[in-house]
């Protein structure tokens, strides 16, 4: 705990016995929207054609290997593949006392994670829902689960304000 506080003085390390981190500047995260756009652009540049439309019929295809890119919707296409959508809510927050050098952080005691996103932060709810039929964010999770966990671990986050959020699916098997 004390060594963690030496590197990240804004963290309340009370109750933390073990923490891991790297400071070699070679780790990070990917913006999935931008990554998707970059992949699509490169594929188009290399001759791929993207066709959008409705499926009119299905037929059997024999192949040694099939790659499905259906993600969370795999079960609708391939019933036997055990992939289930799991709804997950992410909140966007702003804090008057911005901490510029904050790594992606996960608190395993609460399941809440957070990371910087420009001048704001993204924070994920630990509560996920299988078989959710809507993608409305679980707004109550912010007040009940996320904000208390953030404020406990990063005391200046007591002052943060919710600025947005969304829900999406993780594909789980």
Predicted features along the sequence, with ranges:
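Flavin (FAD/FMN) cofactor-binding and adjacent substrate-gating region
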Residues: 1-46, 51-52, 172
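Short, solvent-exposed loop/turn elements at beta->coil junctions and helix N-caps
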Residues: 5, 55-56, 165-170
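Short hydrophobic/aromatic beta-strand or adjacent loop that forms the aromatic wall/cage
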Residues: 17-19, 86-90, 109-111
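A general structural signal for well-ordered alpha-helical segments in protein cores
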Residues: 35-36, 74, 143-147
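Conserved beta-strand-loop-beta-strand element in the redox core of flavoprotein oxidoreductases
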Residues: 52-66
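Central helical "cap/lid" subdomain
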Residues: 63-103
């Amino acid at each position: 705990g004390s060594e963690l506080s030496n590197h990240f003085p804004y963290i309340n390390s009370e109750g933390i016995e073990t923490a891991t981190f790297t400071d070699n500047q070679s780790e990070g995260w990917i913006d999935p929207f931008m990554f998707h756009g970059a992949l699509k652009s490169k594929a188009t540049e290399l001759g791929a054609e993207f066709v959008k439309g409705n499926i009119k019929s299905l037929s059997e295809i024999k192949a040694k290997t099939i790659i499905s890119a259906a993600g969370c919707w795999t079960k609708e296409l391939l019933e036997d593949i055990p992939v289930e959508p799991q709804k997950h809510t992410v909140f966007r927050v702003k804090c008057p006392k911005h901490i510029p050098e904050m790594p992606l952080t996960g608190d395993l005691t609460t399941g809440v994670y957070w990371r910087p996103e420009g001048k704001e932060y993204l924070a994920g709810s630990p509560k996920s829902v299988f078989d959710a039929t809507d993608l409305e964010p679980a707004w109550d999770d912010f007040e009940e689960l996320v904000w208390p966990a953030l404020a406990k671990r990063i005391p200046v986050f007591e002052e943060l304000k919710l600025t947005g959020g969304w829900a999406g699916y993780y594909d789980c098997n």
